[in-house]
Amino acid sequence: VSRDGWDAGTRWSVFDAGPHGIGHQHNDKLHISIFAHGRDLLTDAGKFTYRGINDRSPRDWRGYFKRSWSHNVILVNHKSQNDEINVATEPLTDWKITDLYDFALGTFDKGWDEHEGRHQRAFFNIKDKFWLICDRMELQESSNIQALWHFHPECTVSKTQDEHVFTTDIGKGNIRIAPVIMDSSGWTVGVVKGQTDPYYQGWYSAKTNRKEPNPCAVYEAADVKTAQFAWLITTDKGEPPVYKAEIVYSEGENLKVRIVDNQ
């Protein structure tokens, strides 16, 4: 958990980078939730139900809510993360908490169904300013990937021509997600809500056996084998600030992002 403070209007976020666990777990490694300016903005979808015919399918309610399709993670060829059965034997070491920023690094390497690979995600919370999320994908074979961002049902979500997605609720806390990609020509983004065909997407459950539609931004890129990209996330009560961000260096596991305040 990363937070800027303890008052009612503070920003706080959750980065799920720990071991998967041995029971009651969801396939949500590297998921991020964000609360800011008095309300939930990016969310975990909840659990909805313990009943299902095939909990490995996004056409099954149990499968959708339990597995990666309902979390803020990356899919490979629309497939969920595989199970990662393990127990922590030592503390996580790749994290740092300071007065100016919080940092954590997590890795998922158990594959997505039959697709082998590795997703590494670095989480930075520059306190009272923005979040920078850096992703590195290393896949066994070229695949389509889908980066998901689920919003709380009360959020009204729009997108811009340069593929930013943002909420537009007057007088409330709002959020903007800006992709930081060296070559964005191969990416598309759509916002879905309450989808049932060809599979479930854009559903949220605050309580068991209750569900409702919620917006989900789906960023998709084709023919990805090894790639690095980032997300700049800002919040504010009203209109979130806009920063200019660009990748200035990407080599191996190294990624350098330049961020400039447009205001």
Name the predicted role of every residue range:
Residues L42-K47:
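Catalytic Cys-His active-site segments of thiol-dependent hydrolases/isopeptidases
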Residues I53-Q263:
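CBM-like, beta-strand-rich accessory domains located in the C-terminal region of large
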Residues V1-L41, D99, A222-Q228, V248-N262:
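Carbohydrate-active enzyme catalytic cores, enriched for enzymes
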